[in-house]
From Swiss-Prot:
Keywords: Bacterial flagellum, Periplasm, Signal. This is Flagellar P-ring protein. It comes from Rhizorhabdus wittichii (strain DSM 6014 / CCUG 31198 / JCM 15750 / NBRC 105917 / EY 4224 / RW1). Residues 1-18 form the signal peptide. Assembles around the rod to form the L-ring and probably protects the motor/basal body from shearing forces during rotation. Transmembrane segments: none annotated.
Length: 367
């Protein structure tokens, strides 16, 4: 079977299955298991700052002593230099799948201590480690800082953006690659970014139909397993063909997303409204406080007093009732809400009421 599969890979191009729905490339809706990026972190020292460093923090001093010791410089016991021109930093980077020794990585540097700005600084060579504690890259270079911080002698400050974080494009060199192990596993596994049973079935059918072999199986809403021959070269060709196949993805479920704090409402096109009548009133309560001065009668030995006078006015705005016809769509909802001049907060209340009444056939997500 695998011999026929290999022949099919090199004889056919990755064309899409015909379908009436919206077709997307398989590579855009998921990824192969194991082919992921890995996070790297490290600790380092940035030098060359114009008096905006950590000053006398203990861990900054220890870090600088460690850097000096690598060059054979030993500071006398009890000497803790004031490091206004240096700062302790945390370094982060992302190691892509299949990254090879010698390749360059972009890195982000963030101050750990009291440094006011990293502008103009240079990162001294620092190791970057993975979650397993192994060193995968070495970082060094001049920082590019977009922020600016200025302190005046009178205590006033001016800060633009974030001056305590910066980046070094290509600032790390890969020293060790990560073995993904995809060439020796019994099967390839493709994971959908968003689980959907229909899409999972369609992906498996697209692979089997294009390659002419029943090698792909939909395991669940997220996972598709693929029988594949051994060997990195053949598997790479197979994965390339699969990634570029097109499949008709399932229609997204009807969903309304509401952010009550900001008044943001997002309604997708699958939302439908059952027959229902809606009215939404607006009440305004206004309270006016007017203090009144009360003077005592002449020769009464009374005291001047202040009396509060309150006037409460309640206004309720009359708004018409509107009706949704059977199967009302997103356009109908927007048109009706705009007609009554509802605010985002009003729309949130209307949608919640529609859901409670069972008239909105959609999932309501409140952030």
């Amino acid at each position: 079977m695998f011999r026929a599969l290999i022949t099919a890979l090199f004889c056919f191009s990755g064309l899409a299955l015909a379908g009436a729905g919206h077709a997307e490339r398989i590579k855009d809706i998921g990824s192969f298991a194991g082919l992921r990026a890995n996070q790297l972190t490290g600790y380092g020292i940035v030098v060359g700052l114009a008096g905006t460093g950590d000053d006398s923090l203990d861990y900054s001093t220890l870090g600088m002593k460690g850097v000096a010791s690598r060059f054979g410089l030993q500071l006398p016991a009890g000497v803790n230099p004031a490091l206004k021109n240096a700062a302790a930093v945390m370094i982060t980077a992302e190691l892509p799948a299949f990254a090879k020794p010698g390749q360059r990585l972009d890195i982000t540097i963030s101050a750990l201590g009291k440094a006011k700005s990293l502008r103009g600084g240079t990162l001294i060579m620092a190791p970057l480690m993975g979650a397993d504690g192994q060193i995968y890259a070495m970082a060094q270079g001049n920082l590019a800082v977009g922020g600016l911080g200025i302190d005046a002698a009178d205590g006033s400050k001016l800060t633009i953006n974030v001056p305590t974080a910066g980046r070094i494009p290509g600032g790390a060199t890969v020293e060790r690659s990560v073995d993904a192990g995809f060439a020796t596993t019994p099967q390839l596994r493709f994971d959908l970014s968003e689980g959907d049973l229909t899409t999972s079935q369609r992906v498996a059918a697209a692979i089997n139909g294009r390659l002419g072999q029943p090698i792909a199986r939909s395991i669940d809403a997220t996972t598709i397993t693929i029988d594949a021959p051994q060997g990195a070269e053949v598997r790479t060709a197979l994965m390339s063909r699969i990634e570029n196949l097109e499949v008709d993805t399932a229609e997204a479920p009807a969903r309304v997303v509401v952010n009550a704090r900001t008044g943001t409402v997002v309604i997708n096109g699958a939302v439908r409204i059952a027959p229902v009548a809606v009215t939404h009133g607006k009440m305004t309560v206004q309270v006016d406080e007017k203090p009144q001065i009360i003077q005592p009668q002449p020769f009464s030995r009374g005291q001047t007093a202040v009396q509060q006078s309150s006037a409460i006015n309640v206004e309720q705005e009359a708004r018409p009732m509107f009706e949704f016809n059977p199967g009302a769509s997103l356009a109908d909802i927007v048109k009706a809400v705009n007609a009554i001049g509802a605010s985002p907060a009003d729309l949130v209340a209307i949608l919640e009421a529609l859901k409670q009444a069972g008239a909105m056939k959609a999932e309501l997500v409140v952030l």
